[in-house]
């Protein structure tokens, strides 16, 4: 069985033909249309059409609140033109084939559960650190979608009750690569729009630049506190960290150290006795995670997997 797989991001659409063994062919990417949903549908059809005779359908991972049963997207996230529309039905009508949809963060979590860093886990979580914070929650060995398909939408988690109205006090704004770079610009006295990316930041941090290391420590504490909260709420065995910066050993090493420090800072409290610590690991899949997860979601839907 071969499937046309789309990983729809805010800036690009990654695509490939993938089989049940995760073998990928004809992989590539194109810019994501920013103007209209009609342009978006035209783009998907143009990518699908050359492969229509060799694939059984389309599997998609995309941003937003995605009802995987009906294909309805109640909130399009980075692609607001999808908000309130039957994306699954629209793609199916345009391409003339079966279509399955999954939220991008949940797709990444499904990939890690089925074939990555979370194989065999009963309770676990995935944090995808990027422009925002995505991911998914695993409970009792199953991906948790929630009654409204919004489980695991970490970006909306409030980080400061005293500033509830300030949307800057959410995980999206505190624990994202976007915020890491913004803190670094501010620490260096650079303009808020100064060109900067994660690789440049970690080049500075790995070189021992004091300002970069100071910002990294602050950032890791913001993330570690949320990992701690997950530990308390869900008793997770592992938290897998994904996103481009997760490839940096310095990030994972610093995050583990800061996370352990949270427990040590309350070490003399009798109420901390027996509170478990989770294992922080890097995601196994990187840029292919959403495609792999979209494929697994498709295979579950058509009954090809247990």
Feature locations, PLM:
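Active-site glycine-centered loops adjacent to acidic/histidine catalytic or metal-binding residues
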Residues: 104, 130, 294
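Glycine-rich phosphate-binding loop of actin/hexokinase-like ATP-binding domains
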Residues: 119-174
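ATP-binding/phosphotransfer module of carbohydrate and carboxylate kinases, centering on a glycine-rich
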Residues: 1-57, 68-70, 91-97, 114-120, ...
């Amino acid at each position: 069985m071969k499937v046309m797989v789309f990983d729809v991001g805010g800036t690009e659409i990654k695509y490939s033909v993938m089989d049940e063994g995760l073998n990928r062919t004809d992989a590539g990417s194109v810019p994501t249309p920013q103007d209209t949903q009609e342009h978006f549908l035209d783009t998907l059809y143009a990518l699908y059409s050359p492969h229509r005779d060799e694939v059984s359908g389309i599997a998609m991972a995309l941003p937003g609140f995605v009802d995987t049963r009906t294909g309805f997207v109640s909130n399009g996230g980075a692609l607001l033109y999808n908000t309130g529309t039957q994306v699954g039905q629209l793609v199916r009508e345009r391409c003339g084939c079966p279509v399955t949809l999954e939220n991008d963060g949940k797709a990444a979590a499904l990939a890690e559960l089925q074939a990555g860093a979370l194989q065999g886990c009963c309770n676990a979580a995935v944090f995808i650190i990027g422009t925002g914070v995505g991911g998914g929650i695993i409970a009792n060995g199953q991906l948790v979608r929630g009654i409204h398909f919004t489980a695991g939408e970490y970006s909306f988690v409030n980080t400061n009750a005293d500033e509830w109205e300030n949307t800057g006090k959410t995980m999206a704004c505190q624990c994202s690569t976007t915020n890491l770079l913004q803190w670094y610009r501010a620490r260096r006295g650079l303009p808020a729009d100064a060109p900067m990316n994660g690789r440049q930041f970690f080049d500075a941090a790995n070189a021992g630049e004091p300002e970069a290391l100071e910002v990294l420590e602050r950032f890791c504490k913001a993330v570690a506190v949320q990992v701690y909260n997950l530990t308390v709420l869900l008793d997770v065995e592992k938290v897998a960290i994904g996103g481009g910066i997760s490839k940096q050993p310095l990030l994972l090493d610093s995050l583990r150290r800061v996370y352990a420090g949270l427990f040590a800072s309350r070490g003399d409290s009798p109420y901390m006795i027996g509170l478990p610590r989770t294992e922080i690991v890097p995601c196994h899949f990187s840029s292919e995670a959403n495609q792999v997860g979209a494929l697994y979601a498709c295979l579950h839907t058509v009954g090809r997997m247990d």
